[in-house]
């Protein structure tokens, strides 16, 4: 492998999509450090990206060795996709983007953060996790188990047996850019990546798959992006295993098995516990066992696992009303799972993978939902809402409009102007012993820059509520 800096030094690189989540910022800084000549282009305005832009300008001005970054904001230009050495695109760039087609026409490599890292990295073990639901939990669980047990890991390199592998986290994780990990990783290290369908596009373009892959679930999502084609959606997801080799491993939940080709090159492991969270838990445990982590250490890590922010996260209790943040539930299916988990069993049991033992019985959930339509069906969602929810508070969005116009929500419902009003309305409707569940069921765009901004606002509102 070449020195990573030399691979980017003096290269003319267009970064398509800076964003405000930290990933684009992270690899833009890294490439600037490597001496690349950078053009950053984003459809968002300078005002929308002000935090990221200020940080980059401060970063480059702090060293005379770093070239100034050129910004093209509020638009993309074809000229920025010509006469370049590389284009790095962010997740979610349209499949039919004329700018990507322009780069391809000019034989300019189009890369993505994680797949580009793999091309440049030394020999490291890649553990990739994908799935419409469950991938975030499995990714973090695997990382926590391995990070807490690095001393038990063995280096596969025959020349570095005495060096214990280090464990890193990357992929679709808030605030983490994978490419800059090139500064830290060594031969034999382990990288655990959460991989959404967009990042797996990059794997497909590069014809690579992780050494250990986990595929948790597959159901409709991002149909606005894939233009209602489940086939195209699956084609991207399938890159998690498509290019695996004979000694690689694919771990799946049972309902994914029907999607896996019979001529699979790698070894297939199907987990078989009882419920959704247990299956996700079993996937993480299977990875840990493959890497020879002792069972007692796995159990200890699971016991200490506190769950994930924005995923059925218990926040606080106000006047006897428990409040949960399920902000990352951006599909009807995901919100249905949250409603059922809180209605059928205690969430703590679900997160620990413990079989349900006690149900709440009557309807006690006041649901806050709403947002932008992702072109997904709502029939089953409405049935679950009517069965388990006491009331529904809806925030604005095209998906909300679709839900309201259906006229099928039979429980008490209220349409409000914003999230702040939604929380006030929910607290007004909830009684001692009830649950307020913030689980949008729809995307965040239109009202927020991204789902994290929406989740942060909800947490801030709840923090200030009494």
Where are these regions (language model features)?
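Residue-level signal for inorganic ion chemistry
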Residues: 31, 87, 110, 129, ...
């Amino acid at each position: 492998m070449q020195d990573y800096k030399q691979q980017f030094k003096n290269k003319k690189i267009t970064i398509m999509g800076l964003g405000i989540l930290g990933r684009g910022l992270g690899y833009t800084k890294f490439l600037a450090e490597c001496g690349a000549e950078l053009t950053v282009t984003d459809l968002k305005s300078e005002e929308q990206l002000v935090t990221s832009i200020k940080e980059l300008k401060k970063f480059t001005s702090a060293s005379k060795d770093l070239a100034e970054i050129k910004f093209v904001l509020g638009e993309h230009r074809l000229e920025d996709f010509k006469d370049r050495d590389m284009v790095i695109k962010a997740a979610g760039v349209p499949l039919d983007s004329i700018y990507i087609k322009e780069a391809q026409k000019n034989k300019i490599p189009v890369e993505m953060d994680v797949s580009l890292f793999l091309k440049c990295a030394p020999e490291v073990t890649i553990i990739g996790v994908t799935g419409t639901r469950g991938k975030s939990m499995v990714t973090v669980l695997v990382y926590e188990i391995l990070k807490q047990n690095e001393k038990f890991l063995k280096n596969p390199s025959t020349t570095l047996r005495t060096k214990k592998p280090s464990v890193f986290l990357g992929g679709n994780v808030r605030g983490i850019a994978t490419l800059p990990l090139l500064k830290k990783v060594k031969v034999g290290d382990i990288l655990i990546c959460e991989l959404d369908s967009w990042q797996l596009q990059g794997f497909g373009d590069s014809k690579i798959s992780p050494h250990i892959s986990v595929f948790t679930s597959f159901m409709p999502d991002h149909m606005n992006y894939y233009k209602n084609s489940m086939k195209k959606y699956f084609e991207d997801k399938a890159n998690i295993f498509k290019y695996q080799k004979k000694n690689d491993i694919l771990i799946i939940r049972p309902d994914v098995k029907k999607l896996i080709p019979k001529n699979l090159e790698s070894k297939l492991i199907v987990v078989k516990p009882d419920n959704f969270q247990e299956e996700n838990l079993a996937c993480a445990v299977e990875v840990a066992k493959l890497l020879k982590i002792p069972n007692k250490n796995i159990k200890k890590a699971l016991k200490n696992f506190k769950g994930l922010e924005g995923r059925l996260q218990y926040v606080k209790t106000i006047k006897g009303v428990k409040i949960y943040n399920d902000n990352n539930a951006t599909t009807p299916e995901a919100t249905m799972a949250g409603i059922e988990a809180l209605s059928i069993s205690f969430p703590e049991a679900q997160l620990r993978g413990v079989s349900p033992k006690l149900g709440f019985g009557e309807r006690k959930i006041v649901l806050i939902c709403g947002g932008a339509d992702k072109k997904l069906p709502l029939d089953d969602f409405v049935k679950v809402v009517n069965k388990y929810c006491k009331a529904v508070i809806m925030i604005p969005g095209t998906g909300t409009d679709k839900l309201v116009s259906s006229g099928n929500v039979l429980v008490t419902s209220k349409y409000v102007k914003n999230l702040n009003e939604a929380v006030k309305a929910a607290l007004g409707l909830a009684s001692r012993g009830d649950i307020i569940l913030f689980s949008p069921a729809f995307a965040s765009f239109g009202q927020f820059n991204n789902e994290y901004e929406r989740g942060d606002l909800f947490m801030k509102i709840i923090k200030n509520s009494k």
